[in-house]
């Protein structure tokens, strides 16, 4: 999701150029992944109004949504497929955040803005809110559970 701003297009260009530059050197694009991405785009286009966003190649595939459907998670695709939607406020994404969502990756927000967003909208699905690039970083608190407490066996002797 992008937050509406007068510099939005420049921010998108800068962000996606950096993502592409990083990914093209770290990942080998496989034919099956390219097919999965184009299939995901056509499937999404069959159900909603989307625009294909030009990229240098298929390392990252972007679709720009005209509106945000409540079932957007049904159109997820792995390996670098991104659905983008521009909002005026974070509150616009609240209706899609269900218990299926565990982690929210962010960039450019202050911690207190995100805490207020979660509290104001009473979001129940999010267990972790972390900067982009840290969404898969392992921690001892995972999906809202303290793993030490969860996996520690404490025998009792009476």
Predicted segment positions?
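NAD(P)-dependent aldehyde/semialdehyde dehydrogenase
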Residues: 1-105, 112-123, 129-156
């Amino acid at each position: 999701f992008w937050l509406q701003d007068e510099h939005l297009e420049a921010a998108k260009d800068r962000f996606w150029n950096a993502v592409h530059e990083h990914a093209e050197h770290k990942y080998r694009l496989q034919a099956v992944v390219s097919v999965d991405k184009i299939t995901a785009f056509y499937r999404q286009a069959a159900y909603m109004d989307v625009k294909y966003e030009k990229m240098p190649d298929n390392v990252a595939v972007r679709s720009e949504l005209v509106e945000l459907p409540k079932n957007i998670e049904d159109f997820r695709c792995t390996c670098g497929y991104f659905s983008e939607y521009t909002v005026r406020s974070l509150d616009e994404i609240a209706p899609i955040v269900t218990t299926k969502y565990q982690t929210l990756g962010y960039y450019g927000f202050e911690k207190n803005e995100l805490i207020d967003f979660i509290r104001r909208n009473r979001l129940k699905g999010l267990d972790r809110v972390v900067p982009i690039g840290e969404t898969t970083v392992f921690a001892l608190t995972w999906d809202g559970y303290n793993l030490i407490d969860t996996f520690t066996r404490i025998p009792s002797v009476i």
